[in-house]
Amino acid sequence: MSRRGTAEEKTAKSDPIYRNRLVNMLVNRILKHGKKSLAYQIIYRAVKKIQQKTETNPLSVLRQAIHGVTPGIAVKARRVGGSTQQVPIEIGSTQGKALAIRWLLAASRKRPGRNMAFKLSSELVDAAKGSGDAIRKREETHKMAESNRAFAHFR
């Protein structure tokens, strides 16, 4: 039995302009090589583009996109009797949001386009509407979990 204490769960801080935790989580995931100011620039440009495209509150579009992409269940590889099974597990809200942000950024990086702000804004608008690569990834994950429901007792 471990004598080590459990780590305290860190809460994400909110960003300076929008005072929103989701924006800050997005900034921290898009960050490369410690260039946080560039990450903030990309996010804020993307938010402005969302404002221009949809003519609604861009933060509500962001919230809607992340909520739409957040998975409720995923599969985890588990070794049982010499073979590896894909065991479906439930995902908490924090982990689900983190996965959703990761999928949104991966999908926007794959997109063809001028720059990252343009690609990210397009992906977020698509995800808010219920289409796009990130939504497809969520559906794929849910389908995998559903097809491996027989192994749910291996948890």
Swiss-Prot record:
Oligomer and partners: Part of the 30S ribosomal subunit.
Protein name: Small ribosomal subunit protein uS7cz/uS7cy
Compartments (UniProt record): Plastid, Chloroplast
HAMAP family assigned: Ribosomal_uS7_B
Family to which the UniProt record says this protein belongs: Belongs to the universal ribosomal protein uS7 family.
Gene that encodes it: rps7-A
Residues passing through the membrane, by range: none
Cross-referenced InterPro entries: Ribosomal_uS7, Ribosomal_uS7_bac/org-type, Ribosomal_uS7_CS, Ribosomal_uS7_dom, Ribosomal_uS7_dom_sf
Keyword hit for Chloroplast: yes
Function: One of the primary rRNA binding proteins, it binds directly to 16S rRNA where it nucleates assembly of the head domain of the 30S subunit.
GO biological process: translation
GO terms, molecular function: rRNA binding; structural constituent of ribosome
Main subcellular location: plastid
Keyword Cytoplasm: no
GO cellular component: chloroplast; small ribosomal subunit
Superkingdom assignment: Eukaryota
One protein family per Pfam: Ribosomal_S7
Extent of the signal sequence: none
Keyword set, alphabetical order: Chloroplast, Plastid, Ribonucleoprotein, Ribosomal protein, RNA-binding, rRNA-binding
